[in-house]
Amino acid sequence: DITEIPTSDIADFDFLLAGFPCQPFSSAGLQLGFEDTRGTLFFEIERILQAKKPYGFLLENVEGLINHDGGRTLSVIVTHLKQLGYFVSYRLIDSQFFGLAQSRKRVYIVGTRDAYISLDNFDEHTVLLGDILESGLPVIDSPFTQKLFSHFTPEQVVGKAIKDKRGGEDNIHSWELGLKGETTQEQCDFLNLLLKERRKKKWAEEIGIDWMDGMPLTAKQISTFYSRENLQEFLDELVEMGYLTLEHPRKREKNRRIPDETKPKGYNIVAGKLSFEFTKILDPNALAPTLVAMDVSHLGIVDNGGLRRLSIREGQRLCGFPED
């Protein structure tokens, strides 16, 4: 724990390389910034710089640091570093322009004691995912991949996301694969319609709750855009199959959502993606998305007529490791 290490126990050094925790500023977190105890670890960097007085430093953090708290968080950081006697520069850099087949935006903050360091004079070049992929590797034969290729060809799944959270032509949904039980065309069409309809802000106004991306709708509300006989039984069958859930709308309470039991329950998509063996089939003619540790094992590559995960070597290339 760096907070418990006195600077007298740290050897002298010339350059500090540091990355303070990104969760307080990350779009994947709650973006609490310095309110988060992890966000205060920047001040440990300041403490060490003040005591050891190295020639320079290079700090790294996520894109969210730029605009967090209206830019005030970054301003505090830069001001504190300048007050220590450093010439400070910073820039948001995207790895896709520096030879990596991955879009990964990061803020770099650099400082030295005698000059500003330019972060605008790098040679830029791009590569695509296909440039770093291996071929002919073993593919995965599992119930999931068998289901996938019983409904789609390998060529059809390239570039597709597999999740039930949103719609669109680039998504494949669990009901289109029959993962929880084979569905009829009518059931598929309805679920695709509900997936889009539940996002409309008018439902939040009608229910009397802050809008959320995916409102649970009652059978009566659903009947206003989808009419059929025995609608209630139709919906309940999809609940029994596991494609729909019956739940209360969720009200906003501070930085999270909790069920509002004063509102009637409605039907909602059972959303999620990490429950799927694969959640994204990468396109070799494009870039990989920003890699997240918990998601990377769910990324798929079409290879040799089947589907496999990224190899270790491919993962290393995506992160900029040299071939040796």
Write out the residue ranges for each language-model feature:
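Extracellular/periplasmic catalytic domains that process cell-envelope and extracellular macromolecules
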Residues: 9-10, 101-103, 282-285
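Short catalytic/ligand-binding loop motif for oxyanion handling, primarily in non-cytosolic enzymes
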Residues: 23-27, 65-68, 99-102, 116-119, ...
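C-terminal target-recognition/interaction regions appended to catalytic cores
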Residues: 170-324
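Core alpha/beta nucleotide-donor-binding catalytic domains of modification enzymes
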Residues: 1-55, 59, 63-75, 79-82
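Flexible, glycine-/basic-rich loop-and-beta segments that form/coincide
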Residues: 100-179, 185, 191-192
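Conserved S-adenosyl-L-methionine
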Residues: 2, 63, 85-97
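A SAM-dependent methyltransferase catalytic signature shared across enzymes that methylate proteins
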Residues: 77-92, 113-115
